[in-house]
Design a protein with these regions (language model features):
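Exposed regions on extracellular, virion, or secretory-pathway luminal proteins
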Residues: 53-54, 148-151, 179, 183, ...
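Flexible coil/linker segments and helix-coil junctions enriched in charged and small residues
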Residues: 69, 74, 113-131, 223-225, ...
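C-terminal/domain-terminus segments
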Residues: 304-314, 319
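Extracellular beta-strand solenoid repeats
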Residues: 39, 45, 50, 58, ...
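All-beta strand scaffolds that present successive hydrophobic residues in beta-strands
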Residues: 51, 57-59, 75-79, 155-157, ...
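Extracellular beta-strand-rich solenoid/capping regions of secreted or surface-exposed proteins
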Residues: 44-56, 64-79, 117, 135-154, ...
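Short glycine/acidic-rich loop motifs that flank beta-strands on beta-rich extracellular proteins
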Residues: 66-70, 163-173, 191-200, 214-223, ...
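Extracellular "leader-to-stem" segments immediately downstream of a signal peptide or signal-anchor
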Residues: 1-173, 188, 247-250, 254-263, ...
């Protein structure tokens, strides 16, 4: 019985070992040509190493140096963070591996020095710090060949890695780590200056990483976009930045033109780009979370801007969550993408926080919070591709636009909805916009889209009249409709609070009229506005009218109690169709003391019901309206409570 039992156990052991892979200790670089499992215990040096497709290599004290490794579907097993691929490149792909940046010779020694070597003459040298360390440009180029084409790889940036500007790189951009055609890549940890460019990749997770610039965060000099680089900028003899509340006394000619000189500013290029530059490429299944970006041109970019969007692939199915952004030359988040969720992101000091650009649809921005902006968020599409911009919305977010970031020759806005699919509505809900400016800007909210709906929002607008003589107004219009392909752009405001205040003047007291219109069309063929349960209030006074030459104005159950209207002296000018119900108008009127200026057209239609007007309103219309087109019921003076019928 005992012999029989031993025989059965031996037979079972034989069957088990027959199915197990045999591990071979590698003797030399040419001994891995067959598919197998190889154990590397010493250094292997060669120009080219061929490994059997589908093999596994296990590092156990050895490494590979200076080789181009040719293999497909290679699994790599490393025990720790030491260097195992020293100056190597991969021709093929790896699978099912867990690797670290230092496995490829990257040196994690980036450090911050207390004294700046910034050569730009406007630098306050004693206050800024800069970063230095081993240049990892070559090592990162090597590791990119291993990650390109990979499947099911976990990659850790296990440290802080410096990369210097390369002579062949653009003046404002360090080299990118270029990763192509990978699937199921989880990348995490560490700090980089280099940006990462993913091309034709799917199921990519980037987490717990920091993307920094060459300098720690600092304010930028005033920047020209369309002005001449040779032009000196001063305001009343004071450097522009300080005159506008900036932190540093920049030299008189310390400003930049476009992206020229951003290397001197200490900026790095984009943090992460998902690039689909040709129609045969795509990037899908993107998840960027718990990352930090600072001192970059842009933070995360989904898709690239192109002159012909018919010649690009798709970026689809992306999440950007729980990320922070600080000091970006352009945009923390920009996209030409579909099916995107941006959630719980925050940042400060940027040109514009979020750009939902051409080709973007099914985009949700939720829980975003940004301060110190020049622009607010926008949806914008090239007119030829407007039909592909639809179903986008911003929710539960806040944006503060105070122009601490200085563009000298550009208008500003809090929200921009420019072009979109006809019949679609761009939605902004449960959000707060704070807009503060003492320099000329055309609008706070502008629209070229077919329809914009703002619901349950708060707009805090604080304006100053222009002081340097360049414009009689701080802004022309709070809500403006520009020239557009949309036949009749419309703004819908629902349960929204808008507070508009003029700032105090040092010589003449409170400024009475820092803007011309509340709503106006600037270039648009027609423009319609709808207000429902809204409260528009504040101390600022309008120079012309609240609603200027609208196609249609509908106001219901609202309170309008701003300072009043001065020059024309009426709230609503020349609407074609007007409907007001359950609304109170408060605020002194000027020249005409009239609620509505009647247009000289035959097909107008006006209806005013259950409305209360200010004591300064002596009549409803500038001219006697045609009763066939006018309906007035229960309109009263709020002081005398007397009815007004004409």
């Amino acid at each position: 019985m005992t012999k029989r039992l031993y025989f059965l156990l031996a037979l079972l052991l034989c069957f088990c070992t027959m199915g197990a892979a045999k591990t071979t200790v590698v003797k030399n670089a040419s001994s891995m040509t067959r598919t197998g499992t190889y154990r590397i215990t010493k250094e292997l040096k060669a120009n080219n190493i061929k490994i059997g497709d589908g093999s596994t290599i296990i590092f156990a004290g050895g490494r590979i140096t200076g080789a181009t490794i040719k293999v497909r579907n290679l699994k790599v097993v490393v025990p720790d963070g030491k260097t195992y691929f020293n100056g190597c490149r991969l021709s093929g792909n790896i699978v099912n591996s867990k690797l670290k940046a230092t496995n490829f010779g990257c040196k994690a020694d980036m450090r911050t020095l207390s004294k700046s070597n910034w050569s730009y003459k406007g630098l306050p040298r004693q206050t800024l710090k800069y970063r230095t360390g081993t240049d990892n440009f070559k090592a990162m180029a090597c590791l990119a060949t291993f990650l390109s084409g990979s499947t099911n790889v976990d990659f850790e940036w296990n440290g802080n890695f410096f990369t210097a500007h390369q002579p062949s790189a653009a003046i404002y951009a360090p080299p990118f780590i270029r990763i192509e055609s990978c699937k199921n890549l989880a990348m995490h940890g560490g700090t980089l200056i280099s940006g990462i460019r993913f091309i034709d990749c799917s199921n990519i997770e980037v987490s717990d990483m920091r993307f920094v610039g060459y300098h720690e965060c600092h304010d930028f000099p005033a920047i020209h976009i369309s002005g001449s680089p040779a032009k000196a900028i001063k305001v009343n003899g004071v450097a522009y930045s300080v005159a506008r509340g900036g932190k540093y006394e920049w030299a008189n000619n310390c400003y930049y033109y476009g992206t020229d000189g951003t290397k001197d500013l200490g900026l790095a290029a984009e943090g992460i780009i998902f690039d689909t530059s040709s129609p045969k490429t795509s990037c899908t299944g993107i998840n960027v979370h718990d990352c930090h970006f600072e001192m970059r041109l842009n933070g995360v970019v989904l898709g690239m801007k192109r002159t012909n969007y018919n010649q690009v692939g798709k970026v689809s199915g992306a999440k950007i969550t729980n990320c922070t952004f600080s000091h970006h030359y352009f945009q923390p988040i920009g996209m030409h993408a579909e099916n995107v969720v941006v959630e719980n992101v925050s940042g400060d000091y940027a040109l514009q926080p979020i750009d939902i650009s051409t080709l973007s649809h099914n985009v949700v921005v939720r829980g975003a919070s940004f301060t110190d902006l020049f622009y607010g968020p926008k949806q914008e599409a090239e007119p030829a591709y407007a039909s592909q911009s639809y179903n986008n919305r911003i929710e539960n977010s806040s944006f503060t636009i105070n122009r601490k970031y200085h563009l000298i020759d550009m208008d500003s806005y809090a929200l921009n909805a420019a072009e979109g699919k006809v019949g679609d509505t761009f939605i902004v809900r449960n959000s707060t916009f704070n807009f503060f400016t003492d320099t000329y800007g055309t609008f706070v909210v502008r629209t070229c889209a077919d329809r914009v709906r703002v619901e349950n929002c708060k707009l805090n607008i604080n304006l100053k009249k222009q002081t340097d003589g360049s414009s009689p107004y701080c802004i022309m219009s709070i809500f403006a409709a520009l020239a557009t392909k949309a036949t009749s752009p419309k703004v819908e405001l629902v349960n929204t609070d808008i507070e508009i205040n003029g700032a105090a003047s040092s010589s003449a007291g409170r400024i009475s009229n820092p803007f011309a219109y509340l709503f106006s069309k600037i270039g648009a063929k027609s423009y319609s506005v709808s207000l429902e349960q809204c409260n528009i209030h504040g101390t600022a006074r309008v120079d012309w009218s609240l609603f200027e030459q609208m196609e249609s104005v509908s106001i219901s159950n609202s309170q309008i109690s701003i300072g009043g209207c001065d020059y024309h002296g009426y709230y609503i000018n020349a609407p074609k169709r007007l409907q007001i119900t359950g609304t109170t108008f408060t605020g002194r009127l000027g020249k005409y003391n009239t609620l509505v200026g009647v247009p000289n057209v035959k097909d107008y239609s006006h209806s005013i019901d259950n409305t209360t007007v200010d004591a300064s309103v002596s009549k409803l219309f500038t001219t006697s309206p045609d009763r066939r087109h006018t309906h007035i019921t229960n309109v009263r003076n709020r002081t005398t409570n007397r009815p007004i019928t004409k």
